[in-house]
From Swiss-Prot:
Protein name, as recorded: Phosphoribosylamine--glycine ligase
Cofactors, names only: Mg(2+); Mn(2+)
Source species taxonomy: Bacteria, Fusobacteriati, Fusobacteriota, Fusobacteriia, Fusobacteriales
InterPro entries given in the database record: ATP-grasp, ATP_grasp_subdomain_1, PreATP-grasp_dom_sf, PRibGlycinamid_synth_ATP-grasp, PRibGlycinamide_synth, PRibGlycinamide_synth_C-dom, PRibGlycinamide_synth_C_sf, PRibGlycinamide_synth_N
SUPFAM superfamilies for the chain: Glutathione synthetase ATP-binding domain-like, PreATP-grasp domain, Rudiment single hybrid motif
Organism of this sequence: Fusobacterium nucleatum subsp. nucleatum (strain ATCC 25586 / DSM 15643 / BCRC 10681 / CIP 101130 / JCM 8532 / KCTC 2640 / LMG 13131 / VPI 4355)
Protein backbone atom coordinates (compact mmCIF):
# COMPACT_ATOMS: atom_id res chain seq x y z
CA UNK A 1 0.00 0.00 0.00
CA UNK A 2 1.29 3.46 -0.94
CA UNK A 3 0.49 6.34 1.43
CA UNK A 4 1.15 10.03 0.69
CA UNK A 5 1.39 12.39 3.68
CA UNK A 6 1.10 16.11 2.94
CA UNK A 7 2.59 18.70 5.29
CA UNK A 8 5.96 19.69 6.69
CA UNK A 9 5.68 19.68 10.48
CA UNK A 10 6.28 17.41 13.43
CA UNK A 11 2.63 16.45 13.11
CA UNK A 12 3.27 14.81 9.74
CA UNK A 13 6.32 12.96 11.09
CA UNK A 14 4.17 11.58 13.92
CA UNK A 15 1.46 10.52 11.44
CA UNK A 16 4.03 8.82 9.20
CA UNK A 17 5.60 7.07 12.21
CA UNK A 18 2.22 5.73 13.33
CA UNK A 19 1.07 4.74 9.82
CA UNK A 20 4.36 2.91 9.15
CA UNK A 21 3.50 0.42 11.91
CA UNK A 22 0.82 -1.14 9.69
CA UNK A 23 2.27 -4.12 7.79
CA UNK A 24 0.19 -3.30 4.70
CA UNK A 25 2.13 -0.06 4.17
CA UNK A 26 5.13 -0.70 1.95
CA UNK A 27 5.77 2.89 0.80
CA UNK A 28 5.28 6.32 2.37
CA UNK A 29 5.74 9.50 0.36
CA UNK A 30 6.41 12.64 2.40
CA UNK A 31 5.36 15.79 0.54
CA UNK A 32 7.13 17.97 3.03
CA UNK A 33 10.70 19.12 2.72
CA UNK A 34 11.03 17.77 6.26
CA UNK A 35 13.85 15.22 6.68
CA UNK A 36 11.82 12.68 8.68
CA UNK A 37 11.98 10.30 5.71
CA UNK A 38 15.54 9.51 6.87
CA UNK A 39 14.27 7.92 10.10
CA UNK A 40 11.16 6.10 8.83
CA UNK A 41 11.42 2.89 6.84
CA UNK A 42 10.45 2.95 3.15
CA UNK A 43 9.76 6.68 3.26
CA UNK A 44 10.66 9.00 0.38
CA UNK A 45 10.74 12.79 0.56
CA UNK A 46 9.17 14.51 -2.44
CA UNK A 47 9.28 18.25 -3.05
CA UNK A 48 5.68 19.13 -3.92
CA UNK A 49 3.94 22.34 -2.86
CA UNK A 50 0.73 22.95 -4.80
CA UNK A 51 -2.42 20.85 -4.70
CA UNK A 52 -2.19 20.29 -8.47
CA UNK A 53 1.39 18.99 -8.20
CA UNK A 54 0.39 16.69 -5.35
CA UNK A 55 -2.64 15.45 -7.30
CA UNK A 56 -0.59 14.71 -10.42
CA UNK A 57 2.00 12.85 -8.35
CA UNK A 58 -0.70 10.73 -6.67
CA UNK A 59 -2.16 9.82 -10.07
CA UNK A 60 1.26 8.97 -11.54
CA UNK A 61 2.39 6.85 -8.57
CA UNK A 62 -1.02 5.20 -8.05
CA UNK A 63 -1.11 6.31 -4.41
CA UNK A 64 -3.68 4.34 -2.39
CA UNK A 65 -4.28 6.89 0.37
CA UNK A 66 -3.40 10.56 0.87
CA UNK A 67 -3.46 12.13 4.34
CA UNK A 68 -3.40 15.94 4.51
CA UNK A 69 -1.98 17.72 7.54
CA UNK A 70 -1.74 21.21 6.03
CA UNK A 71 -4.71 23.47 6.74
CA UNK A 72 -3.85 25.77 3.83
CA UNK A 73 -4.22 22.98 1.27
CA UNK A 74 -7.46 21.78 2.87
CA UNK A 75 -8.99 25.26 2.65
CA UNK A 76 -7.69 25.48 -0.92
CA UNK A 77 -9.80 22.42 -1.82
CA UNK A 78 -7.22 19.66 -2.29
CA UNK A 79 -9.70 17.03 -1.06
CA UNK A 80 -12.29 18.06 -3.66
CA UNK A 81 -9.68 17.78 -6.43
CA UNK A 82 -8.68 14.27 -5.34
CA UNK A 83 -12.31 13.15 -5.10
CA UNK A 84 -13.04 14.51 -8.58
CA UNK A 85 -10.28 12.19 -9.80
CA UNK A 86 -11.56 9.19 -7.78
CA UNK A 87 -8.54 9.16 -5.48
CA UNK A 88 -8.81 8.21 -1.81
CA UNK A 89 -7.95 11.10 0.51
CA UNK A 90 -8.43 11.64 4.24
CA UNK A 91 -9.48 15.16 5.17
CA UNK A 92 -12.38 17.61 4.94
CA UNK A 93 -13.68 18.96 1.66
CA UNK A 94 -13.43 22.69 0.96
CA UNK A 95 -16.82 23.48 2.51
CA UNK A 96 -16.07 21.68 5.78
CA UNK A 97 -12.53 23.10 5.90
CA UNK A 98 -14.08 26.56 6.17
CA UNK A 99 -14.87 25.71 9.80
CA UNK A 100 -11.16 26.37 10.28
CA UNK A 101 -10.50 28.63 7.30
CA UNK A 102 -12.95 31.29 8.47
CA UNK A 103 -13.46 31.95 12.18
CA UNK A 104 -16.46 34.11 11.29
CA UNK A 105 -18.03 31.21 9.38
CA UNK A 106 -17.26 28.85 12.27
CA UNK A 107 -18.81 31.14 14.89
CA UNK A 108 -21.95 31.54 12.78
CA UNK A 109 -22.12 27.73 12.48
CA UNK A 110 -21.76 27.36 16.26
CA UNK A 111 -24.50 29.89 16.90
CA UNK A 112 -26.84 28.32 14.34
CA UNK A 113 -26.57 24.82 15.81
CA UNK A 114 -26.37 25.63 19.50
CA UNK A 115 -22.69 24.88 20.08
CA UNK A 116 -21.71 26.51 23.38
CA UNK A 117 -19.24 29.30 22.63
CA UNK A 118 -18.26 32.81 23.71
CA UNK A 119 -20.38 35.80 22.63
CA UNK A 120 -19.01 37.50 19.51
CA UNK A 121 -19.42 39.91 16.62
CA UNK A 122 -17.76 39.71 13.19
CA UNK A 123 -16.66 42.75 11.18
CA UNK A 124 -15.40 43.49 7.68
CA UNK A 125 -15.65 47.27 8.24
CA UNK A 126 -12.92 48.59 10.55
CA UNK A 127 -14.83 51.75 11.53
CA UNK A 128 -17.81 49.69 12.67
CA UNK A 129 -15.46 47.42 14.60
CA UNK A 130 -13.88 50.43 16.34
CA UNK A 131 -17.30 51.81 17.32
CA UNK A 132 -18.17 48.40 18.77
CA UNK A 133 -15.18 48.70 21.12
CA UNK A 134 -17.10 51.35 23.10
CA UNK A 135 -19.91 48.89 23.87
CA UNK A 136 -17.92 46.02 25.39
CA UNK A 137 -15.98 45.16 28.54
CA UNK A 138 -12.29 44.25 28.71
CA UNK A 139 -10.18 42.22 28.28
CA UNK A 140 -11.52 41.13 24.91
CA UNK A 141 -10.35 38.62 22.30
CA UNK A 142 -9.73 39.78 18.72
CA UNK A 143 -9.20 37.16 16.04
CA UNK A 144 -8.16 37.38 12.41
CA UNK A 145 -10.86 35.34 10.71
CA UNK A 146 -8.59 33.61 8.19
CA UNK A 147 -5.65 31.25 8.55
CA UNK A 148 -2.74 32.79 10.46
CA UNK A 149 -0.60 29.78 11.44
CA UNK A 150 -2.03 29.75 14.95
CA UNK A 151 -0.87 33.30 15.64
CA UNK A 152 -3.91 35.39 14.69
CA UNK A 153 -5.46 35.74 18.15
CA UNK A 154 -4.85 38.75 20.41
CA UNK A 155 -6.15 39.36 23.93
CA UNK A 156 -6.58 43.13 24.24
CA UNK A 157 -6.53 44.32 27.86
CA UNK A 158 -8.17 47.68 27.15
CA UNK A 159 -9.74 49.78 24.42
CA UNK A 160 -6.42 51.28 23.30
CA UNK A 161 -4.89 47.84 22.75
CA UNK A 162 -8.04 46.68 20.98
CA UNK A 163 -7.97 49.58 18.50
CA UNK A 164 -4.25 49.04 17.87
CA UNK A 165 -4.97 45.37 17.16
CA UNK A 166 -7.73 46.25 14.69
CA UNK A 167 -5.36 48.65 12.92
CA UNK A 168 -2.68 45.95 12.75
CA UNK A 169 -5.03 43.34 11.35
CA UNK A 170 -7.33 45.35 9.10
CA UNK A 171 -5.13 48.24 7.92
CA UNK A 172 -1.51 47.15 8.33
CA UNK A 173 -2.35 43.59 7.22
CA UNK A 174 0.03 41.88 9.66
CA UNK A 175 -1.83 38.64 8.86
CA UNK A 176 -2.37 39.54 5.18
CA UNK A 177 -5.84 38.64 3.89
CA UNK A 178 -6.56 36.60 7.04
CA UNK A 179 -7.32 39.90 8.79
CA UNK A 180 -9.78 41.25 6.23
CA UNK A 181 -12.53 40.01 8.54
CA UNK A 182 -12.12 40.03 12.31
CA UNK A 183 -14.04 38.40 15.13
CA UNK A 184 -14.34 40.31 18.41
CA UNK A 185 -15.13 37.83 21.13
CA UNK A 186 -15.95 37.73 24.83
CA UNK A 187 -12.87 36.88 26.93
CA UNK A 188 -13.17 33.62 28.86
CA UNK A 189 -10.76 33.08 31.75
CA UNK A 190 -10.05 29.42 32.37
CA UNK A 191 -8.15 26.35 31.22
CA UNK A 192 -7.78 25.37 27.57
CA UNK A 193 -8.23 21.75 26.50
CA UNK A 194 -7.52 20.25 23.09
CA UNK A 195 -9.60 17.29 21.92
CA UNK A 196 -8.81 15.70 18.57
CA UNK A 197 -11.48 13.50 17.03
CA UNK A 198 -12.23 11.55 13.87
CA UNK A 199 -15.48 11.68 11.92
CA UNK A 200 -17.17 10.08 8.94
CA UNK A 201 -20.00 12.66 9.16
CA UNK A 202 -22.20 10.00 10.78
CA UNK A 203 -20.43 9.78 14.13
CA UNK A 204 -17.57 11.64 15.83
CA UNK A 205 -15.15 9.64 17.99
CA UNK A 206 -13.03 11.78 20.35
CA UNK A 207 -9.38 10.96 21.00
CA UNK A 208 -7.75 11.48 24.38
CA UNK A 209 -7.41 15.08 25.54
CA UNK A 210 -4.30 17.25 25.50
CA UNK A 211 -2.99 20.59 26.81
CA UNK A 212 -1.14 22.85 24.40
CA UNK A 213 1.22 25.64 25.50
CA UNK A 214 0.82 28.44 22.94
CA UNK A 215 2.99 31.25 24.26
CA UNK A 216 6.72 31.51 23.59
CA UNK A 217 7.70 32.09 27.23
CA UNK A 218 7.15 30.44 30.59
CA UNK A 219 3.88 30.95 32.51
CA UNK A 220 2.06 31.49 29.20
CA UNK A 221 3.62 34.89 28.47
CA UNK A 222 5.04 36.52 25.36
CA UNK A 223 4.13 36.10 21.71
CA UNK A 224 1.78 33.49 20.28
CA UNK A 225 3.39 30.51 18.56
CA UNK A 226 2.18 27.42 16.76
CA UNK A 227 2.64 25.61 20.09
CA UNK A 228 5.68 25.09 22.34
CA UNK A 229 4.70 21.81 23.95
CA UNK A 230 1.91 19.47 24.97
CA UNK A 231 0.88 17.11 27.72
CA UNK A 232 -1.66 14.31 27.24
CA UNK A 233 -4.07 13.44 28.63
CA UNK A 234 -5.10 16.82 30.05
CA UNK A 235 -5.47 16.64 33.87
CA UNK A 236 -8.44 19.02 33.71
CA UNK A 237 -10.44 16.82 31.32
CA UNK A 238 -12.56 15.13 33.97
CA UNK A 239 -15.55 12.88 33.39
CA UNK A 240 -17.88 15.80 34.13
CA UNK A 241 -16.08 18.05 31.64
CA UNK A 242 -16.16 15.28 29.04
CA UNK A 243 -19.93 14.85 29.46
CA UNK A 244 -20.51 18.59 29.05
CA UNK A 245 -18.27 18.63 25.97
CA UNK A 246 -20.20 15.81 24.32
CA UNK A 247 -23.62 17.25 25.17
CA UNK A 248 -22.99 20.94 24.45
CA UNK A 249 -20.32 20.86 21.74
CA UNK A 250 -19.71 17.51 20.03
CA UNK A 251 -23.35 16.50 19.52
CA UNK A 252 -24.49 19.93 18.21
CA UNK A 253 -21.46 19.98 15.89
CA UNK A 254 -22.42 16.62 14.42
CA UNK A 255 -26.01 17.84 14.06
CA UNK A 256 -24.73 20.84 12.08
CA UNK A 257 -22.48 18.74 9.85
CA UNK A 258 -25.43 16.52 8.95
CA UNK A 259 -27.84 19.44 8.47
CA UNK A 260 -25.39 21.28 6.19
CA UNK A 261 -24.70 18.03 4.28
CA UNK A 262 -20.95 18.58 4.58
CA UNK A 263 -20.41 14.82 4.13
CA UNK A 264 -16.68 14.57 4.77
CA UNK A 265 -14.23 12.18 6.38
CA UNK A 266 -11.43 13.58 8.50
CA UNK A 267 -10.28 15.06 11.76
CA UNK A 268 -12.05 17.64 13.89
CA UNK A 269 -9.88 19.36 16.50
CA UNK A 270 -11.97 20.96 19.23
CA UNK A 271 -10.21 23.84 21.00
CA UNK A 272 -12.05 24.07 24.32
CA UNK A 273 -12.10 26.48 27.24
CA UNK A 274 -13.27 25.44 30.71
CA UNK A 275 -14.45 28.56 32.57
CA UNK A 276 -16.46 28.58 35.80
CA UNK A 277 -17.19 24.88 35.42
CA UNK A 278 -18.66 25.25 31.92
CA UNK A 279 -17.14 24.07 28.65
CA UNK A 280 -16.99 26.44 25.66
CA UNK A 281 -15.73 25.91 22.13
CA UNK A 282 -13.04 28.40 21.14
CA UNK A 283 -12.36 27.07 17.66
CA UNK A 284 -12.45 24.19 15.23
CA UNK A 285 -9.36 22.96 13.44
CA UNK A 286 -10.12 20.53 10.64
CA UNK A 287 -6.88 18.56 10.83
CA UNK A 288 -4.56 17.09 13.43
CA UNK A 289 -3.14 19.62 15.87
CA UNK A 290 0.55 20.46 15.97
CA UNK A 291 2.07 19.68 18.47
CA UNK A 292 -0.92 17.81 20.00
CA UNK A 293 -0.57 14.98 17.46
CA UNK A 294 2.97 14.30 18.60
CA UNK A 295 1.75 13.52 22.13
CA UNK A 296 -1.59 11.89 21.31
CA UNK A 297 -0.67 9.36 18.58
CA UNK A 298 2.04 7.62 20.66
CA UNK A 299 -0.68 6.89 23.24
CA UNK A 300 -3.00 5.26 20.66
CA UNK A 301 -2.90 1.47 20.99
CA UNK A 302 -5.17 0.94 17.99
CA UNK A 303 -3.79 0.84 14.46
CA UNK A 304 -4.28 4.39 13.15
CA UNK A 305 -4.47 3.31 9.51
CA UNK A 306 -7.27 0.88 10.35
CA UNK A 307 -9.11 3.68 12.16
CA UNK A 308 -8.75 5.95 9.11
CA UNK A 309 -9.98 3.19 6.79
CA UNK A 310 -13.02 2.65 9.03
CA UNK A 311 -13.83 6.34 8.64
CA UNK A 312 -13.35 6.22 4.86
CA UNK A 313 -15.72 3.22 4.75
CA UNK A 314 -18.31 5.12 6.86
CA UNK A 315 -17.96 2.44 9.54
CA UNK A 316 -16.76 4.38 12.59
CA UNK A 317 -19.90 3.40 14.51
CA UNK A 318 -18.57 -0.16 14.66
CA UNK A 319 -15.08 0.50 16.02
CA UNK A 320 -13.50 1.38 19.35
CA UNK A 321 -10.19 3.20 19.66
CA UNK A 322 -7.96 1.85 22.45
CA UNK A 323 -5.48 4.00 24.37
CA UNK A 324 -2.45 3.36 26.55
CA UNK A 325 -2.99 3.97 30.25
CA UNK A 326 0.02 6.26 30.22
CA UNK A 327 0.90 9.94 29.86
CA UNK A 328 2.88 11.86 27.27
CA UNK A 329 4.90 15.07 27.34
CA UNK A 330 6.12 16.81 24.19
CA UNK A 331 8.65 19.66 24.44
CA UNK A 332 9.26 21.74 21.31
CA UNK A 333 12.86 22.77 20.65
CA UNK A 334 12.86 25.95 18.57
CA UNK A 335 15.42 28.15 16.87
CA UNK A 336 16.46 31.16 18.94
CA UNK A 337 14.40 34.19 17.93
CA UNK A 338 11.28 32.20 16.98
CA UNK A 339 8.50 33.21 16.32
CA UNK A 340 9.98 36.42 14.84
CA UNK A 341 13.43 36.14 13.24
CA UNK A 342 15.70 33.11 13.46
CA UNK A 343 18.63 31.39 11.77
CA UNK A 344 18.47 28.25 9.67
CA UNK A 345 21.18 25.78 8.77
CA UNK A 346 22.62 25.03 12.21
CA UNK A 347 23.90 21.49 12.86
CA UNK A 348 21.84 19.35 15.26
CA UNK A 349 23.75 16.94 17.51
CA UNK A 350 22.48 14.15 19.76
CA UNK A 351 19.73 12.72 17.55
CA UNK A 352 21.61 9.45 17.10
CA UNK A 353 20.84 8.63 20.76
CA UNK A 354 17.14 8.11 20.02
CA UNK A 355 15.16 5.51 18.06
CA UNK A 356 11.46 6.37 18.00
CA UNK A 357 10.58 2.84 16.85
CA UNK A 358 12.16 1.05 19.81
CA UNK A 359 11.58 3.33 22.77
CA UNK A 360 9.02 5.40 24.63
CA UNK A 361 11.30 8.37 23.96
CA UNK A 362 10.54 9.81 20.55
CA UNK A 363 11.92 12.64 18.43
CA UNK A 364 9.66 14.04 15.74
CA UNK A 365 11.23 16.36 13.16
CA UNK A 366 9.65 19.71 12.26
CA UNK A 367 12.03 22.32 10.81
CA UNK A 368 14.80 19.85 9.94
CA UNK A 369 16.75 19.25 6.73
CA UNK A 370 19.33 16.59 5.91
CA UNK A 371 22.62 16.91 4.05
CA UNK A 372 25.20 14.11 3.78
CA UNK A 373 23.53 12.11 6.58
CA UNK A 374 23.67 15.06 8.97
CA UNK A 375 20.70 17.05 10.24
CA UNK A 376 20.37 20.84 10.31
CA UNK A 377 17.77 23.34 11.48
CA UNK A 378 15.38 24.53 8.79
CA UNK A 379 12.56 26.36 10.55
CA UNK A 380 11.30 28.03 13.70
CA UNK A 381 10.02 24.98 15.52
CA UNK A 382 12.75 22.41 14.93
CA UNK A 383 12.16 19.28 17.02
CA UNK A 384 9.46 17.66 19.14
CA UNK A 385 10.95 15.73 22.06
CA UNK A 386 8.34 13.27 23.35
CA UNK A 387 8.36 10.93 26.33
CA UNK A 388 5.72 8.33 27.27
CA UNK A 389 5.61 7.20 30.90
CA UNK A 390 3.25 5.68 33.48
CA UNK A 391 2.65 9.09 35.06
CA UNK A 392 2.59 12.64 33.76
CA UNK A 393 5.25 13.67 36.26
CA UNK A 394 7.65 11.01 34.95
CA UNK A 395 6.86 11.87 31.32
CA UNK A 396 7.70 15.54 31.93
CA UNK A 397 10.93 14.70 33.75
CA UNK A 398 12.04 12.29 31.02
CA UNK A 399 11.20 14.69 28.18
CA UNK A 400 13.38 17.41 29.70
CA UNK A 401 16.16 14.93 30.37
CA UNK A 402 16.10 14.05 26.66
CA UNK A 403 15.99 17.70 25.57
CA UNK A 404 19.35 18.18 27.28
CA UNK A 405 20.83 15.36 25.16
CA UNK A 406 20.19 17.35 21.96
CA UNK A 407 21.96 20.52 20.91
CA UNK A 408 22.01 23.11 18.15
CA UNK A 409 23.09 26.75 18.08
CA UNK A 410 20.79 29.11 20.01
CA UNK A 411 18.22 26.38 20.66
CA UNK A 412 15.29 27.51 22.78
CA UNK A 413 12.58 25.65 24.66
CA UNK A 414 10.11 26.45 27.40
CA UNK A 415 11.15 25.12 30.80
CA UNK A 416 7.63 24.64 32.18
CA UNK A 417 5.68 22.39 29.79
CA UNK A 418 3.10 20.63 31.92
CA UNK A 419 4.41 21.99 35.19
CA UNK A 420 1.72 24.67 35.43
CA UNK A 421 -0.74 21.81 35.89
CA UNK A 422 1.39 19.13 37.58
CA UNK A 423 4.04 19.99 40.20
CA UNK A 424 7.31 18.57 38.88
CA UNK A 425 10.95 18.90 39.86
CA UNK A 426 13.56 18.24 37.20
Amino acid sequence: MKVLIVGSGGREHAIAWKISQNSKVDKIFAASGNAYNKVIKNCENINLKTSDDILNFAIKEKVDLTIVGSEELLVDGIVDKFQENNLTIFGPNKEAAMLEGSKAFAKDFMQKYGVKTAKYQSFIDKEKAIKYLDKISYPVVIKASGLAAGKGVVIAQNRKEAEETLNDMMTNKVFAAAGDTVVIEEFLDGVEISVLSITDSEVIIPFISAKDHKKISEKETGLNTGGMGVIAPNPYYTKTIEEKFIQNILNPTLKGIKAEKMNFVGIIFFGLMVANGEVYLLEYNMRMGDPETQAVLPLMKSDFLNVINSALNKDLKNIKIDWEDKSACCVVMAAGGYPVKYEKGNFISGLEKFDSNKSDNKIFFAGVKEENDKFYTNGGRVLNVVSIKDSLEKAIEEAYKNVKEISFKDNYYRKDIGTLYVPVKY
